[in-house]
Amino acid sequence: MSETISKHDTENEKKIAQEWFRELRDQFCNKFEEIDGGKFTRKTWKHSGEGGGEMSTLKGAVFEKVGVNISTVKGEFKEDFRKQISGTEEAPNYWASGISVVAHMQSPFVPAFHFNTRFIQTGQKWFGGGADMTPSILNEEDVNFFHKS
């Protein structure tokens, strides 16, 4: 009985995570469009038997190019890599869903920005991710603000 509940809960968590990343993608795209005035184009992609995702791209007046991408993938880790990943001791399978945002500005005074987060399930589950800014023209005040945030 507990295995059935656990499996159901795991599948529900996957569904919730996918929907949350989709909603987060829509929020990012809406805000970028509001700032820029341009519109995103969307393209889906699939990887045979291992999942897929949607790429959203905007080229505009404020942003040279923005990509807001979501994906859900599954598969099996190769044996040599499996040892480095938590939760793969009993089974080498993984499932992951996430979002990645990359924004390059028209102005060299505004840093490029990257953000990603993902939900990963092996025999364990966790969220991972990060963010970074890459300035074309270094502004120490911006650097300090970013690192304090």
Regions found by a protein language model. Give the residues of each.
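Compact, glycine/acidic-enriched structural inserts
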Residues: 123-149
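Internal mixed beta-strand/loop scaffold within catalytic domains of large alpha/beta enzymes
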Residues: 54-129
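Intrinsically disordered, low-complexity regions
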Residues: 1-2, 55
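Hydrophobic/aromatic-lined pockets within catalytic cores
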Residues: 29, 33-37, 107, 118, ...
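Gly/Pro-rich turn-and-neighbor structural signature
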Residues: 9-86
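Short, charged/polar, low-complexity loop and linker segments
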Residues: 2-9
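Generic structural signal of hydrophobic/aromatic residues within well-ordered alpha-helices
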Residues: 28, 85, 99, 146-149
